Amino acid sequence: MTVVDLSQTLKTGMRVYPGDPSVKIVQVHNLNREGWRLKNLSMGSHTGTHVDAFSHMDKNGNTLDKIPPDKFFGPAVFLKSTDKLPNNKGLIFGKDRLRIEDFNKIISAKPLFLGISINCDFPVPLERKLLQFGVIIFGNLVNVEKLPKKKIFMFYGLPLKIKDGDGSPIRAVAIY
């Protein structure tokens, strides 16, 4: 069995989307003083490798706490936008260029979810439209080049259960 970690490491000062809050991770308690470690995390809900809830770009979309956990994992395949898309699988794209014109092709495949590499050109209008059509989107995936090409694997990207959450950092993994 192979496990591929598809997640960015969260750290103070890491690159974030322009206009998003910066990441600050501050030590609050430590072993010498209190006998345990505890850090305060401050960041946006779409920082690093994350998932978008439908409410991220749709005023009528469900928030994270309203989406069942079984929607955040499933069989997936790593491919290019020019490939034939399999039906009823998660679709993971690497260094690619998706376009708004790809919307119908993606929707007709009835994807369980979309995974987008940190190196993928993914336009906001396409993201918005997919979320409005009920497609969960995992963003800023890394190490996708380690995934098997056009072969099915299991993808897991469970978010924190944030009340009224529009997104959440995740620990994304693929297992094959």
Features from the language model and the residues they span:
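Active-/binding-site microenvironments in catalytic and ligand-binding cores
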Residues: 1-176
